[in-house]
Amino acid sequence: MNATQYDHYDDFDRERLVPEPAKSAALPGTDTEHRTDFARDRARVLHCAALRRLADKTQVVGPRHGDNPRTRLTHSLEVAQIGRGMAIGLGCDPDLVDLAGLAHDIGHPPYGHNGERALNEIAKAFGGFEGNAQNFRILTRLEPKVLDADGRSAGLNLTRASLDAVTKYPWRRTEERRKFGFYVGFPDDDGPAADWVRDGAPVDRPCLEAQVMDWADDVAYSVHDVEDGVISGRIDLRVLADADAAESLAQLGAAAFPSLAHDDLLAAAQRLSEMPVVAAVGKYDGTLAASVALKRLTSELVGRFANAAITETRAVAGDRPLKRFDSDLVVPDLVRAEVAVLKMLALQFIMSDHQHLQVQADQRTRIHEVALALWAQAPGSLDPQFAPEFAAAGDDGARLRVVIDQIASYTETRLERVHEARSPRPLE
């Protein structure tokens, strides 16, 4: 393996759960070792079917809404790009953070967080459903790439550091925690793979690369959801300068983010309103000049939020290359408050729209009805990848997990096609 300036990662970080033989199809004399292990991992994520399916999964509005929709796939590409730039500034391996950005939503079901809510309702008695835990399950089990010695899938068989970089919430489900990273509590669960990835890691502490990915995710969707809202006419940035509107945003933000004070959120709204790049957007009208002003705004905000975290982290950790548990990412509260205000803009003017809420209710009903139909007719209703797992499952919880895995893998187009064709029978 060729050395790089990121050689502060060691063999433990680069270890794979299942040892792999050398490639056998290379021409004699061909150099097959010019990529790092993390570059290979990034390629595995980039080429996997689960990533491609994100093109037909909702980010905020549906993937078939408008001419230039943001989907879970385009969002993941944006997170990967922001994270990669931050990694370079922090001395983390950029391929490692890049792949974490690509994979961070790979477990999302149809209809994004709304679909996640529906599947969690269906599976609540058997471990629930959480997109981040589904990420881990896809990467370590469901996505076909490598088999272990017993013929069982090891998923993409990514390195330990790569899997950890995708893990925002490195803990199991508990009553106190709505978010979690691993499914456990049923036969043949994901606990052994989770234990292997987290071997020697501080309890409940995400690695630095995962923290960078998480902040890149926050930056991407806060800025770009607002951009999409402005283009659609649902958001007018001039509301930031309105005292009543700013107060409403601050109240929403304080309720959603208890670590942020109301007055800090109010001050953040004022700072945003006073930025020249915000004022330049004004009342967006779709002209070339307006589009350029909006694109400049998004570029400057992404840079502001990403660079603030790099600078603050460097002030604490110094200038050395950083990896895994060398440091935590330090994000100034001032910047966290600004990102929170942008999130609340999208929440108030897009996600809370009555028509949007009705669409979401219909989506959840559709998922519930498909789940009933698949369950009633399983294993015959399941894909060849999932039917044997259902037949081999030892109890209803494990069998339901297989049905959930199949639904989570659907694109929205396929889910709707299955829904139209279903012939549900009541459960016995």
Swiss-Prot record:
Start and end residues of each HD domain: 72-222
InterPro entries (UniProt xref): dGTPase (IPR006261), dGTPase-like (IPR050135), dNTPase_2 (IPR023023), HD/PDEase_dom (IPR003607), HD_domain (IPR006674), PHydrolase_assoc_dom (IPR026875)
PROSITE patterns attached to this UniProt entry: HD (PS51831)
Compositional bias per record (Basic and acidic residues), positions renumbered to this chain: 7-18
Gene Ontology MF term list: dGTPase activity
One example of a Gene Ontology biological process annotation: dGTP catabolic process
Transmembrane segments: none
Domain of life where this protein originates: Bacteria
Keywords: Hydrolase
Stretches the record annotates as Disordered: 1-35
PANTHER family found in the cross-reference section: DEOXYGUANOSINETRIPHOSPHATE TRIPHOSPHOHYDROLASE, DEOXYNUCLEOSIDE TRIPHOSPHATE TRIPHOSPHOHYDROLASE
Family as reported in the entry's similarity comment: Belongs to the dGTPase family. Type 2 subfamily.
NCBIfam families tied to this protein: dGTP_triPase, PRK03007.1
Protein name: Deoxyguanosinetriphosphate triphosphohydrolase-like protein
Species name: Mycolicibacterium smegmatis (strain ATCC 700084 / mc(2)155)
